[in-house]
Regions:
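Hydrophobic alpha-helical segments and their helix-loop junctions in multi-pass secondary transporters
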Residues: 157-187, 204-206, 246-253
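TM-loop-TM module centered on a large, flexible mid-protein loop between adjacent transmembrane helices
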Residues: 75-78, 82, 115-119, 232-295
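Helix-loop junctions at the membrane interface of multi-pass solute transporters
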Residues: 29-31, 79, 196-226, 230, ...
Length: 304
């Protein structure tokens, strides 16, 4: 009988930790550009985009509640559809999904590592560092899945710190109510063009990766109960974090400043809060966020 290693909390951090990567830190300006600086429409974009992950999770939760098959969605496909469908899905996941996502996320970790340690940011250096990091995480998870689970829990908690910090400080020292009131009046007076719908493009990838968590279903304690619960709770946690961070940083800096500063807006906000070390702190949090995503992907990959 296989040892059950992961509890409900690890399962939730697996889903949220993979989905919440580094991208959310740098998406606020893109969304505001597409919505013409309207924060309320930006919130609507997050809500509508979350429909896919929420109902996707609810759908898979129904299968998870009926099966504890190994291999995640591949096991579900074999049990509820057939071996051919499971085989096709398995090859797709190995070659096109994990086979591309894992190296790309590892490379991104190499990019941020070069920035943090002031290493010459050449493609060779980025890829070499990313390869070393990827190899270390594969070794860690293959030698001890429990250690991988602990890292997933820790990285998820750590990456939430700056998101919630910006949210709280923005709510306190910014004026989100005034911004939303202004946005409502703007919509009433000028209307809304269809152009704001293009804001879905920059955040589409910000909701990806949740399906990986079902790969560890056979290692989850009482998986028929805990996995469906995690699949229901996690998308709501992700949505709440995204909206709170977006509202917080936009209220703190102002929509015009966020759009003008672009990706540097998060570093500007961090500098206002923490002083000259703010930029370094944010970079550390971003790297931890990427490593949490990478660890979750690898943890799910080796359980296929």
């Amino acid at each position: 009988m296989q040892e059950k290693k992961y509890g409900l909390f690890t399962t939730i951090t697996m889903i949220t930790g993979i989905v919440i990567g580094s991208g959310i830190f740098f998406k606020s300006d893109d969304i505001l550009q597409y919505t013409n600086g309207n924060m309320l429409l930006g919130i609507a974009v997050f809500l509508i985009a979350a429909i896919a992950i929420i109902f996707g999770c609810l759908t898979i939760a129904q299968l998870a509640g009926r099966s504890d098959a190994t291999g995640g969605v591949i096991g579900y496909a074999e049990e509820f559809v057939g071996r051919k469908a499971a085989g096709a899905l398995g090859w797709f996941q190995v070659i096109f999904y994990f086979g591309t996502l894992v190296p790309v996320v590892a490379w991104v970790s190499g990019i941020y590592a070069c920035q943090l340690f002031q290493i010459e940011s050449t493609l060779d250096n980025q890829m070499m560092i990313g390869f070393v990091i990827m190899t270390l995480f594969f070794a860690m998870n293959m030698l001890s899945g429990a250690v991988g689970g602990y890292f997933q829990n820790a990285s998820m908690i750590i990456k939430l710190i700056p998101l919630l910090l910006f949210a709280v400080i923005g709510m306190i020292y910014g004026k989100p109510g005034a911004v939303i009131s202004h946005d409502i009046e703007s919509i009433k007076s000028t209307g809304v063009s269809a152009g704001w719908l293009t804001a879905f493009a920059p955040i589409a990838f910000s909701y990806d990766g949740w399906i990986v968590a079902v790969s560890i279903g056979h290692k989850i304690k009482n998986s028929k109960r805990n996995l469906p619960i995690a699949l229901i709770i996690s998308p709501l946690v992700i949505l709440a974090c995204y909206i709170l961070y977006f509202v917080g940083i936009t209220s703190l800096l102002g929509t015009d400043t966020v759009m003008a500063q672009g990706n540097d807006s998060v570093f500007l906000a961090a500098t206002q809060i923490f002083g000259h070390i703010g930029g370094k702190l944010i970079l550390i949090f971003v790297i931890i966020s990427v490593l949490g995503t990478l660890n979750g992907l690898i943890l799910g990959f080796i359980q296929l």
